[in-house]
Each structure stands twice: as C-alpha cells, then as structure tokens.
Amino acid sequence: MEFYLSSDCASLARYVSKVVYLEDNDIAHIYDGELHIHCSKIGSEDFSFRTVQKLELELSKIKKGPYDNFMQKEIYEQCETTKNVMRGRVDAFTNRVVLGGLENWLTELRRAKRIIMIASKASFHSCLAARPIFEELMEVPVNVELALDFVDRNCCIFRNDVCIFVSRSGETTDTINALNYCIKKEAVTIGVVNCSGSSISRFTHCGVHTNTGPEKGIATTKSYTSQYIALVMIALWMSEDLVSKIERRKEIIQALTIVPSQIKEVLELEPLIIELCDKKLKQHDTFLLLGRGYQFASALEGASKMKEISYVHSESILTNELGHRVLAVASDNPPIIAFATKDAFSPKIASCIDQIIERKGNPIIICNKGHKIWEQDKQKGNVVTLEVPQTVDCLQGILNVIPLQLISYWLAIKKDIGVDLPRDSAMSAPDI
C-alpha cells in the first residue's frame, strides 16, 4: 500500500481517492505498509482514531467543470468557501469563536496596545473592510498598511503591537519583507493565508488558515471573502473577554452562520447583471464607485476588479467626497455604482444618490431587499437596483462585493477578454 503526505489535498487529487485528515497534536507513523496515528497531547489516549474520507476535491476542484472560466467557478464557490473558513471555528449555539491556531498566544494577543494589518492588493482591501470591527470590539488603535509602503517608511513597531499579515498565497514578496521587519522588532505576528505550508504561515508566531482551496484565476474572488470572514473571526476571538461587547459579538456570530446561504441569494442576480452589462455598461470605459463606512472597502475592491479584469478605468470614491468636483464628472454620465445598503450612513448616502439623479445621472444602486426608497426613480428609469440580503453592518461587504465580481466578469466576457489570465498582470497564475 502506498501513502502520500501533503499539506494540501489538491496536489493529491490525481493520485488518490481517499484521505485521512490529521488534527492538532496528531502524529502519523507509517511503517511496514500500515498507518498509526498517535496523539501527543498530555492526558489524551495514545492512539487517535481518524475516519478515512473520500477526497471530495478530486479533479473537479482543480478543473473548470461546467463553468466557462475559473473566475466564474470561483465566484460560485464562495457559498462553500465561506462555510469552510468557519467550519469548526464558529459555534452559533454557544456564541463563541474558537481559533486553535492562536490559542498559544492568547495572553499576548489580548494585551495588544495596537493592531497593524499588513497586506497587498485585494488582501489590503479585506483588511480595510475588517478594520472598523477591530476598532469597535478591541477598543485599540488599528492601522492598515500596504506592505511595500510599510517597509519603505521604516514604521515604528513595538513589542506590544500585534501585526496581522494577510496573503492569498502566503508568498507575497512585499508582505514577507514586512513580516521579517516586524519579527526583528519583536512584535507578535499572525498570518492569515490560504496555503498552510507557505512562508508567511511558517514564519509568523500563529495564524488562521482560510481553507479556501485552489484559486486558479488571477482575480481574487473567493479568497477575498474568506479573508474578510477570517479577520472578523479574529476580532471576535480577541475581544471575547470584554463583557461590554457580548451582545454585539452574539449578533455578529449569528449573522456569520447564514452568510453562505445569503451569498447563494446574491448569485441569483447574475441574469440581471448580464442584461445590465449588455445593454448599459459594456460601451463605457469609465466607472465611478461610491461607498462609505464599511462599504468604502467594497468600492475599492470592486474598482480594482474592474480595472484588472474588464480593462476599464474605475475609481472608488468616499460618498461624502461627492461634492468635491466629482459631481462635475457625474454630469458626463459615466456609470455610477453606489453602495447603499442599510447602516448608520444610509440617510447620507441616499442624499448623495439624489444629487446624482438631479444631475441626470442614472446610478446603479446596490441596496437591501425590500428597500423601497428608490422605487419611484426605478419606475421612471432613473436608477437600476441590485438587491442583496441584509446582514449585520460589518458583514454586509461580503455580500455587496459579489455583484461587482459578476459585473467585472461579464464586462470582460462581453469584450472577449480572457478573465483567467488578464494582460500585463503582475501576478503569475496561482496553483495554491
């Protein structure tokens, strides 16, 4: 009998059909054609019993299957990948988050005087999306840094800082350089990566694996939403000892459990988005995306995807900056996509959208289902709405970014652009 050992079951899909997943403290001993699993944890039985499971990944997980492109496949996989990142970690019955990869550093992490999140590209946007909930739950300063700029500035780092490094591959050069810098400064480091054997996962003190699976498309789609959830879970876990945040934590944990099913609802917008791209968007080469609060990160990520995949100029703008000469551009009728889901800023965002409509703009509004504020304008043809399910404010960006992924994808398809390998990409096609 042959045994294969790997940190990623995707690499074994073409060789095996059954796997045994080791858990924390397991030691696998292979001798004379037999596998024995021992538990090294003190107080546990010497032998551990692990179920032999069918490798569900198989070749289908690293092939397109019924989809035309890997990007489309990976957009649709987000229902499953968001479940995977929470599996065994989020307990809706006890309202607790368990992150075994951080437990050994519990004391140091909860004593943090400052949290610094460091990343590049889409991972940087996921950090921006999670920053407000860290500030709210932890009540400490939270910085988000672009890895290259962070190193260039020789930032001040102290021993009581916690530095979180986020990367899809775990091999992003700029992020690794920033990690080495923080290690020299003796800060506590956390890695949030998809590949458990990567450089960032090995060099950080502790970490969270996103369990996203292979992402073969250049555009980051499912990794973005998985990183977003992983960071929210870290914020929930680190704030568990704060009594004043109990009710807020419960609200978020309960909302996390239904995110996968809500993503499925969002994906049902695809036929409407295809029609929208075909009739209204494909002839344009400039787009403006408006967001505020949690949704500014969604605007940044959406604009990035449209540049990267659709080859259009797209700009993300804080909604309250609309009056600073942006309305002059809006009068030229570039498509404006506004995030207007319900949160603390909804009335102000609605006011900005009204200003756009008054200037003969025809915004595309991403709003919650049942939000009737623009119903009259919709009937007049002044606006188009893409309605997504409502969730707690700090998670709404997970649902809001998916329509932008679909818009970017279908704009590229309408222009006959190869979405999996866009031109002039600074990244190589990943196989992680």
UniProtKB/Swiss-Prot annotation:
UniProt GO MF annotations: carbohydrate derivative binding; glutamine-fructose-6-phosphate transaminase (isomerizing) activity
PANTHER family: GLUCOSAMINE--FRUCTOSE-6-PHOSPHATE AMINOTRANSFERASE, ISOMERIZING, GLUTAMINE--FRUCTOSE-6-PHOSPHATE TRANSAMINASE (ISOMERIZING)
A Gene Ontology biological process term: UDP-N-acetylglucosamine metabolic process
Residues spanning the signal sequence: none
Gene3D superfamilies recorded: Glucose-6-phosphate isomerase like protein, domain 1
UniProt KW keywords: Repeat
Organism domain of life: Eukaryota
Transmembrane parts of this sequence: none
Domain SIS: 105-244, 277-422
Protein name as annotated: Uncharacterized protein YMR085W
